[in-house]
């Protein structure tokens, strides 16, 4: 028995087979509990059995190989979360904490040397990209945050995978790396819904995190441009609708005992995010097109308004279904009073029953991407990178943002068919720096002077609030191009910088929201 390998480590455990018996060893009470709960995982009991309604499937026995051995101990000494939601069962929270191999349930923010607190505060839908959790926490760990990790959440049920990823990294920092986040997500989905469903769910939910990474549903109060790049608004909605259509055949692969978990963690978030996007963006389009004096006769504005109104009615019905599931077990968790965007959409004028009937079957229109006079690419398609550069899966609008270490750089080349004024737009992802350093990057075009910009988070800055909601900080560098080959160099100066996308735009005053990257470049 490997007692000597765990006895000097806090919260460690070992599981082995001795004389035909399964043996669990713990270095302390926590370690023993973690070991026993590890056995329950091996038997198919999810840590989310109660919080996620992941009903355990019946098994007749648990068998381990005669040479089975696992020895585990934590990478971070104190691991846990702050649950700020109302009416949460403290006993159930402590059970979940143990099942996630945590040892700290805080009621106030973490503080002190070696401590790191991360905000995963969604109160409605899960919208923090998995790559964001990995990037922020791994960077903090590398900078010395190894004593205490705390996730600030509202309700653990809402952010089940995010909290699982956070706690898994705190337990063993090597579980996840920059490129295997999708594999970790697949393993988690398999634990909840089975491998067959997980195989089909992974691409669907990866695209879900792509779309919510472009804009969080609870912040869908932004203008997408119908006249930008071949109608970025309709393409965004069409991508959402494709996800919704993919859910029905997958649901049939989920065991009946897990159907409530599938609805709460997959069906509801995807559909609700889609309906919120349709509701908000089509209402915006109706207001943009229509005028109060002519709204009742404006078929284009009416079509957008009816699509928005229909989505709103469907969203209300979906919320009622969520609140009523399992005899209202989770009704109190869906408090949407704090969300102004959940209100009825506003149009230039009233909608008649006749208009609703006429345009009720309207859906997203097919629009092909038109990159116009731009050269656009995701940052991961660099020509050259210095040592230490890493592509991070499931992060950014590209879902492949690039981490550039201090002093490191990315280089790109392009050929300009046009000459004259242009702007180089660089989309970075601002991460809070654990050590409090400034977060600066420089952008140099050809042999010109490097433009140095800070992308450090500043909660008091309106520009930062816009960037936080967008998920990107846009750095613009004015250039005067010749018809020739050109080079762009992006360098991190103080701390790691995450670069997402870049664009050479020959229309410096262009209004748009989404960088026009083709599907082949994703």
Put a short name on every predicted segment:
Residues 23-26, 82-87, 103-107, 117-131:
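The substrate-binding groove and active-site-proximal loops of carbohydrate-active enzymes
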Residues 21-23, 78-80, 95-96, 102-104, ...:
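Beta-sheet entry/capping signal
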Residues 27-29, 86, 102, 107-114, ...:
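An acidic- and aromatic-residue-enriched active-site/binding cleft used to recognize and process polar
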Residues 2-7, 88-90, 95-115, 179, ...:
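Ser/Thr/Asn(+Pro)-rich, low-complexity disordered segments
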Residues 48-109:
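An acidic-aromatic substrate-binding cleft motif
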Residues 1-73:
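Contiguous, structured surface segment used for ligand recognition
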Residues 111-385, 485:
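Substrate-binding groove of N-acetylhexosamine-processing glycoside hydrolases
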Residues 347-522:
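Extracytoplasmic
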